Amino acid sequence: MITNERVRRPISDQELERRWAEVRKILAEKETDMIFLQGSNMHLGGYVRWFTDIPAEYNYNMTVLFPADDEMTLGRSSASPVPAWALRGVREIKYAPFCPTLNYSAESEVGLVVDFIRSRGAKRVGYAGKAFIHSAMMLSLLHTFPDVEFVDLSNEIDAVKALKSDEEMECARATARLHDAVWEALPAIVRPGMKEYQIRAELVRLATNMGSEEQLVFLGTAPQNTSCGMPTFQYQNRTVQEGDYGVLLLEVSGPGGYYCESSRNFSFGEPCKKLADAYQVCIEAQALTASMLTPGRPSIEIVAAYNKFVAERGYCQEGRLFGHSQGYDLVERPAFMCEDSRGNEDMVIREGMCCSLHPYLTDDFQTTYINDNFYVTKNGAERIHTIPYEMIIL
């Protein structure tokens, strides 16, 4: 394991070797010479870190080239060299001067991958995460190697990545404890007269000082009996007033890069009836769906049960993303989404997953949101946060 003090929480050598062994099993089963994948950021770039324990950052692409019979080769921008002591299972890093905003530099990045595939004489090449591999890369590879078969191995890699080892769950639980501490501090931070972005800045500072690696914070406030929504940073300029209520969503990773999510409503004084009623439905809806987090269940069944529950009580149904697994990625498979003619999640719930469930109810009079992480055991789900369910009264 890395012992350099510059890394907050390195993953162990044993854990990396476990992952590599699983990948090599997949390559052997699929008769594939190698697999490649890309990432460009931390909150949705988990493939790269899962293979290497090195995050992709700042929207600069990082490419992992993983052969079936050798150590990895990495492709990175020459603007961000990796120290030698941080490399494990890596034979070499190939650097090139590229940046996604410099359209003409894409060929420099692509050339690293072309040269590697050609040098290996690969005939069957796997890839994972097609939504992360940019068009210049795939177009060039398909044109340059017309006789090479490119195989999507995303499902196979995702199935392994979704099941958390004991060490990975240690990281996830540490992140949950960090969230718990931020929520405990919230009443001392939020006060009337502050801009929403100032509250956000204090929360980010606190999480960072406790070891968090990346912080996405959604925050909205409004007068009672109106909707506050859940604004992103661009729309967090409102000044908080006495008597307001709000929604706070923390999408914050801990030391080691594992994500959790947590959300609660808060209110200056007692909430109005419409807000209090909707919040209670959120609590009940999450309890219902958490009870359904059992091995073998399709996630689409959980979404259907949730939508039926809230619709019967007169609230909006979820048409986007009700829940999902988490790890190095903020959103991992399986996703909890409604049936869609263009494609559905086919990964079932399994023991060892760490899932986020987030009932969200909004109308003209209120916005309520509850979010917690649950670890799936053979006997059902275990909530890993200790935040009280009650709305926070300030």
Which residues fall in each region the model found?
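Active-site neighborhoods and metal-handling regions in enzymes and metal-associated proteins
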Residues: M1-L394
